[in-house]
Amino acid sequence: MTFIIKKVKNIFSTKKINNKTNNNNFKNENLNIKNEILNNNNNNNNNKNNNNNNNNNNNIENNSKNENFNNFNKIHNSPISSPNLSPSLNSIDSINLNKIIIQNIDNFETNGNILNTSSPSLNSSVAKNNFIISDIQDIDWNNLVNIELLNNNINNNNNTNNNNNNNIIILVTFYNGYDDFNQVILKSSNTMVQDVYASVLQVILKYPVPEMRLIDSCEEEFNKMSINLLKQSKLQSEQLFNIIQTQIEKPFFLIMEYKNGGKFFSQLNHKEYFSSQKNGEKKLKQLGKLLSFDLICNINNNICNFNYNNCNNNNNNNNNNNNNNNNNNNNNNNNNNINNCNNNNNNNISLNNSNNNLNSIFNNNNFNIFSNIIFYEQPDKNGWYFGIIHSSILCLNSSSFTPGYRNTMDRIKLLLFSIFQNPTTESLQIYHFRKYLSNNCNINLPSSSVHWSTNIQNGIAKGIDELVNSLNYQVFASTKQIVNNMIFSTTDQNNNNVIINNNNSFTWKKGIDLIYIPFLFDVLKEIIIEHSNYKNKSKK
């Protein structure tokens, strides 16, 4: 099934495909794909022999790259033969297709860790951003020419054994001829349902969420995507191939619109980017608005983690006595039963360890602060300088009876009180966040740091105002129902909605059950109370 999130207020366009139709076409298509793999295997065995001869002749590097590009064209242009497969292969269903791909992929042409298989003219055109579009609908997966990991935490990690527990965000490039390139973002996730839920809420709040659609492993397109991702990643590097191989075992992928020319937070010249000459004040306020969303959906993973006096004491003791610091950390964990001050010795921001997903704003890798955001020099048509490439929710199933519930609410109250009480004064939480960026990430903000902080705080206050006016219990509940019906939904003879039962639908249902509306609403109520107190005080 597919869905599209449109960047229009409260409009969600859902494309549904009846799973009960075209079954024969689906099977035939899968057989054709399998047969294509077998044909490619035979072709590429010959290619391997050619490469061996090339290596023996010690051809120069440029000739080797050209040979690989030719082989790439052979792979992608090889005809799909008719499905005259043996009975044993005919009996293999679509669920096992990825296993066939993985078993046969080694027969594809490779040559070490080639980082780019495109021709020099293609590379130069991409570098100049000529004729680049981002069309998530009409994708010809056979035209895939490059894969780039956008997750710095995976990209910089040589250990790929545990990549199945990670989520990847990759940029894929398609060459459609005549210097026409299409670039889209692909995202896999262990918590796809929660990610989609958060994205829908962000659309309601008019945040810069890209157009996106969801595909699942029961679809024909998913198989075509998997085949071409494996082919191209094998041509580029063994590490990338291993990552892709584990990710395509997940049941869902998001295809997202991509706007080129952006940077991650760690790549910015922060003093220049947030300077007054470049609308730095507006950028900081927008960043604050995104932080306000995390107060609801990522409470264990946001700016509130900088508000504990015990954390401050531990950081000070860290300079004097590491043993005392360890004891303080243990006491905090026992008393609060939540990961607020965890790992202060390593100066890590605390995370909810029960979740493996990418963190919406912060990440335990020092170089992945604001890792879900791409920063742009020029605003989009709605005035946003950012693009959100990852959304998620933490602490979904907490209630008043779970450890840390009251602690969570107190953290929200303390942050909002400090911001609303003195909006023009840098709050303690923002102060420690700024110090963290400077001391741990080597990110030095503009010299007028208090101005930087107060703009962030003003953005949080503005974001809170929009949250209070846009969200309520009914919105949380109806959004959950929207996400529940996004895929595997069809109609019976009486036009009643029916959920199709298969492995993917069960996985989706489990994700839906983890979205605990009462907790989200309790958090919102605390925010509403603090917001109301601030408004009443302002009127006096």
From Swiss-Prot:
What is stated as this protein's family in its record?
Answer: Belongs to the protein kinase superfamily. AFK Ser/Thr protein kinase family.
Renumbered to this chain, the signal peptide range is none
Protein keywords: Coiled coil, Kinase, Transferase
Recorded hits in Gene3D superfamilies, A to Z, give: Phosphatidylinositol 3-/4-kinase, catalytic domain, Phosphatidylinositol 3-kinase Catalytic Subunit, Chain A, domain 4
Recorded hits in Pfam families, A to Z, give: Act-Frag_cataly (PF09192)
Q: Does the keyword Transferase apply?
A: yes
Domain of life of the organism encoding this protein:
Eukaryota
State the residue spans of region: Disordered.
37-70, 317-341
Q: Where are the transmembrane segments?
A: none
In alphabetical order, the GO MF annotations are:
kinase activity
Q: Which residues form a coiled coil?
A: 27-68
Keyword Lyase annotated? no
Organism of provenance: Dictyostelium discoideum
Q: What protein is this chain from?
A: Putative actin-fragmin kinase DDB_G0287957
